């Protein structure tokens, strides 16, 4: 496996990738009917911008870890300041939910606490966040996607996202592929990405069903994108959120003993 020596993560590199966008033909979902089958992909709105996210459970949204940190200060966003808007389209959405809490890998959180930013290949490998919604999304509104195991280079993939210049509509880049698997389980793709594409699901088709292979972490001006391998990280974060939910609620007059 090759070592990803210096991948510029998050918004810094995605700004450069915006120049490559003009080379790519996106399937822009201009009408509500175009969203059929993609209802579980949505826009994650935060105090200072937005990312793309996707449901992987009735009350779980998958996105990139750097989306839940302020890019200027490196401080984590409060969950109450985030809203997931499934199937967002020109100001409306199929449904929307506030975020109740979120979790990122310990290694990513430690790096942000120490340096205020993450710019290494290892950072891309842990650039995953799982968000617990305040209320679940019903099956009548959107069906969550499942996470796929890591494929081999050459596997065809597609990226579904919001982005700069297409903030109000969901778009799909239908024709890119896995180009490389690097050290730390970082995956490379020949997909063009830009601001807002952070956290966008990278889809692979398995037995005629779409599965999420990765999420967009970063990209460059050459039309290359990078993202982490998901299964182990998503499992870890899901378990952590479940443990937190199982803790006794602290009420007035009571004190939690840890």
Please place each PLM-identified region on the residue numbering.
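Active-site substrate-binding loop(s) of clan PA
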Residues: 54, 71-73, 109-122, 129-165
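Short conserved beta-strand and strand-loop elements enriched in small hydrophobics
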Residues: 42-44, 79-89, 155-161
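Catalytic histidine site
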Residues: 37-83
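Protease-domain processing segments flanking chymotrypsin-fold serine proteases, especially trypsin-like
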Residues: 3-12, 16-56, 106, 171-174, ...
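Conserved catalytic-core segment of clan PA serine endopeptidases
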Residues: 21-36, 50, 75-137
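Extracellular/periplasmic catalytic domains that process cell-envelope and extracellular macromolecules
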Residues: 34-37, 47, 55-56, 75-78, ...
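Catalytic nucleophile loop of clan PA
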Residues: 54-55, 192-216
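Short beta->alpha transition motifs characteristic of CBS
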Residues: 64-67, 213-222
């Amino acid at each position: 496996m090759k070592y990803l020596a210096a991948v510029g993560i998050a918004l810094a590199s995605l700004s450069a990738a915006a120049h490559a966008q003009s080379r790519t033909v996106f399937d822009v979902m201009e009408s509500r009917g175009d969203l059929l089958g993609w209802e579980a992909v949505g826009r994650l709105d935060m105090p200072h911008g937005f990312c793309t996210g996707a449901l992987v459970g009735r009350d779980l949204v998958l996105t990139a870890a750097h989306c839940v940190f302020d890019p200027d200060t490196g401080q984590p966003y409060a969950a109450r300041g985030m809203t997931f808007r499934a199937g967002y389209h020109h100001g409306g959405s199929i449904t929307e939910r506030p975020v109740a809490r979120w979790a990122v890998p310990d290694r990513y959180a430690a790096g942000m606490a120490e340096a205020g930013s993450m710019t290494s290949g290892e950072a891309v490998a842990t650039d995953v966040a799982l968000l617990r919604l305040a209320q679940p999304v019903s099956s009548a509104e959107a069906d969550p996607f499942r996470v796929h195991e890591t494929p081999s280079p050459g596997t065809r993939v597609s990226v579904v996202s919001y982005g700069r210049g297409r903030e109000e509509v969901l778009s799909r880049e239908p024709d890119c592929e896995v180009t490389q698997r690097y050290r730390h389980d970082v995956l490379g793709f020949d997909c063009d990405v830009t601001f807002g594409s952070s956290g966008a699901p990278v889809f692979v088709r398995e037995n005629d069903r779409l599965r999420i292979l990765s999420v967009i972490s970063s990209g460059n001006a050459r039309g290359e994108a990078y993202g982490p391998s998901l299964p182990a990280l998503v499992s870890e974060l899901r378990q952590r959120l479940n443990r937190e939910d199982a803790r006794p609620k602290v009420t007035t007059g009571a004190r939690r003993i840890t």
